């Protein structure tokens, strides 16, 4: 019985030490981050723009979003509520919209442990394609989450997943 208690105490100590290391390490990382990726898509700017702004269709091609609900802020600004695969609704609002050129979307909830903007910049590419640059200017408040994102998950993992599924979606539409 004493051996079992020592093993349990040892496991608890290892987990606590791991969390402490993540907390201290995360506290030393910057709260803000920037991640930028560029892809060339085999679709016109208009087709890419439609895919980016047809929020209701997003769950059909991006598995990270299970549902989208439309809404409005008190000032009339359009909101979308994206339900993620964990059932959490995250509100987004459009900060800037220049059709076929630039779209900036922002998380519209300052109570979340993370936030920021995604900026989409579209430019002509060879053969009628589109060069899409996706920039995340974000922040992560909890130091443990910051460390996990930086060291284990990757700060650009969601962007990479999004762009991969967007590219597949546009290829299927041809």
What are these regions (language model features)?
Residues 40, 60, 69-117, 126-131, ...:
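Glycine-rich portal/gate segments that line the openings of hydrophobic small-molecule binding cavities
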Residues 3-20, 131, 137-174:
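A conserved amphipathic terminal alpha-helix motif
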Residues 40, 50, 86, 114, ...:
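Extracytoplasmic/periplasmic, Sec-exported soluble proteins
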Residues 53, 130-133:
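Ser/Thr-centric signal marking residues that sit
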Residues 38-40, 121-123, 133-137:
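Residue-level recognition of well-ordered beta-strand positions that form the cores
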Residues 45, 49-55, 62, 91, ...:
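Extracytoplasmic/secreted envelope proteins and their assembly/folding machinery
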Residues 4-7, 14-73:
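Hydrophobic ligand-binding cavity/cleft-lining segments
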Residues 56, 89, 139:
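Short alpha-helical
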């Amino acid at each position: 019985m004493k051996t079992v208690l020592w093993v349990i105490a040892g496991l608890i100590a290892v987990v606590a030490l791991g969390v402490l290391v993540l907390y201290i390490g995360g506290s030393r990382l910057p709260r803000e981050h920037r991640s930028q990726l560029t892809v060339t898509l085999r679709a016109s700017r208009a087709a890419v723009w439609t895919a980016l702004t047809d929020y209701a269709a997003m769950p059909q091609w991006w598995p990270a979003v299970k549902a989208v609900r439309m809404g409005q802020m008190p000032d009339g600004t359009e909101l979308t509520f994206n339900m993620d695969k964990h059932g959490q609704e995250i509100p987004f609002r459009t900060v800037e919209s220049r059709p076929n050129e630039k779209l900036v979307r922002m998380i519209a909830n300052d109570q979340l442990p993370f936030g920021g903007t995604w900026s989409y910049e579209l430019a002509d590419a060879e053969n009628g394609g589109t060069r899409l640059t996706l920039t995340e200017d974000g922040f992560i408040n909890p130091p443990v989450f910051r460390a996990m994102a930086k060291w284990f998950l990757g700060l650009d993992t969601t962007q990479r997943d999004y762009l991969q599924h967007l590219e597949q979606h546009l290829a299927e539409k041809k």
